[in-house]
Curated annotation (Swiss-Prot):
This is Small ribosomal subunit protein uS4. Belongs to the universal ribosomal protein uS4 family. It comes from Methanosarcina acetivorans (strain ATCC 35395 / DSM 2834 / JCM 12185 / C2A). Residues 198-209 have a biased composition (Basic and acidic residues). Keywords: Ribonucleoprotein, Ribosomal protein, RNA-binding, rRNA-binding. Residues 192-218 are annotated as: Disordered. One of its GO terms (biological process) is translation.
Length: 218
């Protein structure tokens, strides 16, 4: 039992700390998502492990021969888990309990605020996205958000932008990326949609025909 007022760990460390394959995967995730250390990977993995454990218990209850599937408390628990994961965009709206077992750590890391700031085109790199957040330049629904690891719901994702008095609100700011991903309230275009459109326009055309063969000597 922890002391009152003392924060307990919200994650589990690996049981076998020196597994080469797992360590290599963790390093890749730290680099890809601009994480501060492996602890942030372990937090995401622990969260995923918790949901998968609950999903297995529910599936085991169904497999135990209960007629009519999930009922009562089990049905309510199943709906709550699915509703939360759908709300945060971790699974699709038509997903079921079985789909939770196929989730990966990356599915959790993709919903972090730091990742979403990069995906929406508000920062050039994932490291810059973290810097903008910790320095108070990013807001959700107009409220400053300074925690890079907070999970962002699909609804809040549409309202991520620069904080009200941040210098980055100025489009000529040297650290601000080229803004083609601005939220257009009148047309309903989101930052994400605009960013995806920009990526499609900048995709280089495929070269056809291959390399031309040189003719033989005469």
């Amino acid at each position: 039992m922890a002391y009152p007022g003392k924060k307990s760990k919200s994650y589990e460390t690996p049981k076998h700390p020196w597994q080469e394959a797992r360590m290599a995967t963790e390093v890749q995730l730290v680099k890809a998502y601009g994480l501060r250390n492996k602890k942030e990977v372990w937090k995401a993995a622990s969260m995923l492990r918790m949901y998968r454990s609950e999903a297995r218990k529910l599936l085991a209850h169904v497999a135990s021969g209960q007629e009519g599937g999930l009922e009562g408390h089990y049905r309510t628990q199943s709906e709550e888990i699915l509703s939360k994961l759908i709300r945060y965009g971790i699974i699709k709206s038509d997903a079921n309990i079985d789909d939770i077992l196929s989730l990966k750590t990356e599915n959790i890391l993709e919903r972090r605020l730091q990742t979403q700031v990069l995906r929406l085109g508000l920062a050039r790199t994932v490291i810059q996205a973290r810097q903008f957040i910790t320095h108070g330049h990013i807001a959700i629904n107009g409220r400053k958000a300074t925690i890079p690891g907070m999970l962002v719901s699909k609804e809040d994702e549409m309202h991520i932008g620069y904080y009200g008095n941040s210098p980055l609100k100025n489009e000529s700011h040297p650290e601000r990326p080229v803004q083609v991903a601005s939220f257009l309230a009148d047309s309903g275009t989101t930052l994400k949609a605009a960013a995806e459109a920009k990526q499609a326009r900048e995709k280089p055309p495929e070269r056809g025909g291959g390399r031309r063969k040189r003719g033989g000597r005469r």
